[in-house]
């Protein structure tokens, strides 16, 4: 009798925001990076991708992927690499145990939803590919560890490998040509430093002009600064950042985070022709963070920017009133602040020009903090 059952599994996966940046591939096909990187996984209460993976012999249209209600192309090499790798691991289980249903031979139907704007510099591809890989791994009942699964997610989107873990996560660049040692590992769980918070200023929810993939390869090919960055700057920053996290040393964490962001965007500007992901609002956000730190007399906030204009500001819970209060005051009427922000009292006031640049350019804020890795859920998307 043929198996007509529909098998399914769902997971949520988080966004991660790098504090030591990934920029540049040494192998574009396998998504192998030119340097290691390190990120903070953000709470799924605020930013998450929900993905349901199902398979059945009755799915006659072949594999499919629906993202935010729209059919998405799955013919790309990256998605295909993830499917192929996961199927082969399931097939190995089926070969070892003939009583298992032959799920590896059934078409896959993936349905995914983000609760944040896609492709606007909010690391949506990282959460998306991490969720896709984890959902299929749950569906196939694979015994692989998050680090093993990160090898697969990496082939979909480099930074996705870091979204297989919660907390503070390193992506080790590895040295092997086949990429078998280029994977994520846990630097520290969220519970090690749970006080870490992030305020995201969404400067533009529009799709970015130069995609990360093409941008980074232009940098590799044309930037003179790039070699210095991958040879000296990043290895030093990785060591300092791991130390800062281990010691819960926020001033050190903050300085490395800001210097790293500056270094990354300097190599983008040094690309020929230059790439500019940041805009006037981004630069105003930097001035705002500098203003806060200067007026407080210690480093209480750190800015970082990925390949887009959105500013992510890291701070510790104990300084929430200072940071949230200052931005709440400047961004009156902008949505996304959490309950209690209105009562946050900050002694910091930005000058009128800075405040009005921020108010005009920031479309919303997202208030969040460090969080956990993918979570299996009983919430299913059709």
From Swiss-Prot:
- Could you tell me which InterPro entries the record lists for this protein? GHMP_kinase_C_sf (IPR036554), Mev_decarb (IPR005935), Mev_diP_decarb (IPR029765), MVD-like_N (IPR053859), Mvd1_C (IPR041431), Ribosomal_Su5_D2-typ_SF (IPR020568), Ribsml_uS5_D2-typ_fold_subgr (IPR014721)
- Record's protein name: Diphosphomevalonate decarboxylase ERG19
The UniProt GO MF terms for this protein read: ATP binding; diphosphomevalonate decarboxylase activity
Which PANTHER family does the UniProt entry name for this protein? DIPHOSPHOMEVALONATE DECARBOXYLASE (PTHR10977:SF3)
Recorded source organism is Gibberella zeae (strain ATCC MYA-4620 / CBS 123657 / FGSC 9075 / NRRL 31084 / PH-1) (Wheat head blight fungus)
Induction notes from the record: Expression is regulated by the Zn(2)-C6 fungal-type transcription factor FgSR which binds directly to the promoter.
Report the domain of life of the source organism: Eukaryota
Query: What keywords appear on the UniProt entry?
Result: ATP-binding, Lipid biosynthesis, Lipid metabolism, Lyase, Nucleotide-binding, Steroid biosynthesis, Steroid metabolism, Sterol biosynthesis, Sterol metabolism
SUPFAM superfamilies this protein is in?
GHMP Kinase, C-terminal domain (SSF55060), Ribosomal protein S5 domain 2-like (SSF54211)
| Binding residues for (R)-5-diphosphomevalonate | 22-25, 78, 157-162, 213
- Which pathway does this chain act in? Isoprenoid biosynthesis; isopentenyl diphosphate biosynthesis via mevalonate pathway; isopentenyl diphosphate from (R)-mevalonate: step 3/3
Q: Which GO terms describe its cellular component?
A: cytosol
Which EC number applies?
4.1.1.33
Its GO biological process annotations read: isopentenyl diphosphate biosynthetic process, mevalonate pathway; sterol biosynthetic process
The reply on keyword Lipid metabolism is yes
Function field? Diphosphomevalonate decarboxylase; part of the second module of ergosterol biosynthesis pathway that includes the middle steps of the pathway. MVD1 converts diphosphomevalonate into isopentenyl diphosphate. The second module is carried out in the vacuole and involves the formation of farnesyl diphosphate, which is also an important intermediate in the biosynthesis of ubiquinone, dolichol, heme and prenylated proteins. Activity by the mevalonate kinase ERG12 (FG05912) first converts mevalonate into 5-phosphomevalonate.
